[in-house]
A protein has these predicted regions:
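Core subunits and conserved enzymes of cellular information-processing
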Residues: 57, 62-156
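Transmembrane alpha-helical insertion/packing segments
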Residues: 2-55
Length: 156
């Protein structure tokens, strides 16, 4: 079935609302929980496994959206990818706000204008940055694209 035919399939309103609800739920709760686990790993173990957290977030988002539908539609997969990207943003906000809080010991010292800026968390995708061709950045991009593909494919 071609891409045009997949978009022409009818969308059931009940499925659409259920998918949007589940996507937002997983983006917020999954992002907060996985961000807290990422913070715990950075603080206690001293290293970061954000690529592993990407797969966990993509898996949880795709599974939750797949269970929320009766009939499959390509819009649901696109919503899954958008929920994954929102969850990735919330995961990073949670982890970095927690790191600043545990370092300074006060909520008033957290620079919310920097913490809530999404450009900071998605800067690794910017091809004109000076760090774009570093090995760690290339690995981050590869795992991010694989996680997006996973969220798209397995939410069908």
């Amino acid at each position: 079935m071609g891409l045009k035919e997949q978009f022409r399939k009818p969308i059931h309103k009940q499925d659409l609302f259920s998918v949007i609800y589940q996507a937002l739920f997983m983006a917020f709760t999954g992002g907060i929980l996985i961000g807290a686990v990422l913070l715990l790993m950075i603080r206690l173990l001293g290293f970061e496994l954000s690529w592993l957290m990407l797969f966990v977030l993509a898996m949880l988002t795709a599974r939750r959206i797949k269970q929320a539908t009766y009939e499959k539609h390509i819009i649901f997969s696109i919503i899954s990818v958008l929920a994954f990207i929102l969850g990735y943003y919330i995961m990073n906000v949670t982890a970095y706000a927690g790191m600043i809080f545990t370092t300074t010991g006060s909520v008033s010292n957290i620079p919310f204008d920097l913490i809530l800026n999404p450009v900071y968390y998605f800067y690794f995708l910017y091809p004109l940055s000076s760090t774009f061709f570093q090995v760690s950045n290339i690995l981050e991009i590869v795992f991010f694209v694989i996680a997006i593909h996973y969220a798209f494919k397995y939410s069908k």
